[in-house]
């Protein structure tokens, strides 16, 4: 199993996004994925998942969730 990487952010740190769609937005680190080097920032990088209905009486839906971003795309504030 690969060893986790040392990252420059910790859970609870306030960070600013420096690249991507959410550039210049700020948020708090809520989770760290050390094996991939990605972090989850509260209120940043929302993605949508479309779910088809399973039966005719069922209704499809669109779920919104926060996706992780690479730690190199943020800086501490």
Curated annotation (Swiss-Prot):
Q: Give the signal sequence positions.
A: none
Gene Ontology molecular function: any one: rRNA binding
Could you name the Gene Ontology cellular component terms for this entry? chloroplast; ribonucleoprotein complex; ribosome
- SUPFAM superfamilies in alphabetical order: Translation proteins SH3-like domain
Q: Which SMART domains does the record match to this protein? A: KOW
Assigned keywords, A-Z? Chloroplast, Plastid, Ribonucleoprotein, Ribosomal protein, RNA-binding, rRNA-binding
Q: Where in the cell is it found?
A: Plastid, Chloroplast
Where is this protein chiefly located? Answer: plastid
State one Pfam family annotation.
Answer: KOW
What Gene Ontology terms for biological process does this UniProt record contain?
Answer: translation
Q: List where the protein spans the membrane.
A: none
Q: Give the matching Gene3D superfamilies.
A: 2.30.30.30
Q: How does it assemble?
A: Part of the 50S ribosomal subunit.
Q: What does this protein do?
A: One of two assembly initiator proteins, it binds directly to the 5'-end of the 23S rRNA, where it nucleates assembly of the 50S subunit.
Task: Provide the family line.
Answer: Belongs to the universal ribosomal protein uL24 family.
Protein name (database record): Large ribosomal subunit protein uL24c
Q: Which organism is it from?
A: Thalassiosira pseudonana
């Amino acid at each position: 199993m690969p060893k986790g990487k040392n990252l420059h952010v910790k859970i609870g740190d306030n960070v600013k996004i420096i690249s991507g769609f959410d550039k210049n937005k700020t948020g708090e680190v809520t989770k760290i994925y050390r094996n991939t080097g990605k972090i989850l920032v509260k209120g940043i990088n929302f993605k949508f998942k479309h779910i088809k209905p399973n039966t005719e009486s069922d209704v499809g839906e669109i779920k919104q969730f926060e996706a992780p971003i690479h730690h190199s795309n943020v800086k501490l504030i």
